[in-house]
Amino acid sequence: MQDLIRASLVIALLSGCTASPMLKYSLDVPAQTMSVLDAPEVQDGRARFREIFCSTLHEHPDRKRRGCDELLHRLRDEAPSAPQPGPPPAPDHRLRLVFVTGLFNDCASTVALPFETAVAHLRSLGYSAEILSVSGRSSSSYNAASIAEIVSQAPDGDQRLVLVGYSKGAVDILEFMVAYPDLAKRVSAVVSVAGAINGSPVADVAAPFYQRSLKDVSLPGCGPGDGGALASLARPARLNWLVTNRLPNARYFSLVSFTRPDTVSSPLRPFAAALAEIDPRNDGQLLFYDQVIPGATLLGYVNADHWAVAVPIEEKRPVLATLVTGHNWFPRDMLAEAIALYLSEQLAAEQDTR
């Protein structure tokens, strides 16, 4: 009888009959990813990226608002910072950084586009940078064609093309890399920022409703596309795609975002709470271990939610940021600069070893 009672208690616990999520928010864990069998090994670039990001932050006018160690999470297994950080890399102005937008971003383009202010900042530093606003309501295969068109127009020469994908934009880039292998050879590096690499449980729940009720509904600022955006982000779709598709040779880098539940933007809080039933280390759209490209170099864990890491609502629409979203401040321009500097160093080192 006692064994039956114990078994019933265990079943009740595992069935979700708890007052709060079983996992607690904590940084006392190592870096981790979830991927498919035989996936390429992820490399750890956190220590050097932290050095570069912290050095760029010294140039930010609001650097005292939050310290560098508060902006980048330090998980249990990250190597301690060196007493004397290495010298900052020399910027490689041959880089051409193309930032690919994510889910529904074109629908909100009048508010702000991902890395909109960062692109202007990078240009002021001498880099070539631009935003590719893909169809926010379309499937990743649909948007891969748009990326292919941009890449096909890239001039020959010593320019180094870097594709930076935010959220679903990262997935669109990966589909491009596989579907257009000849064009993919022109890409020097791929960077995911809060990339939906493994998909999201949020999409698993929302995709059927969207397909039934919203797929063909007109929305301001964006056409319906092929209607497959959320279906592309479902976890079965993404994980099965990773099983059947090997990424071509290129350098891959991933920057992950997550933050505490109380620092999530207000509209994202219901999603963050739902995801916390799986793991509280999420950004309001994605779990932290779902954001790393197989075989990528892990750059770090940004202490920001899914919008704050990339979308400059505070800069572009300060009233909206204050009254509606909240918690949107983040030095995105410095983050983009640190990415460019890190790539400058890494791609130069790769060239030297050839």
Locations of regions flagged by a protein language model:
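Short aromatic-enriched loop/helix-cap "lid" or pocket-rim segments at secondary-structure transitions
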Residues: 111, 200-206, 263-268
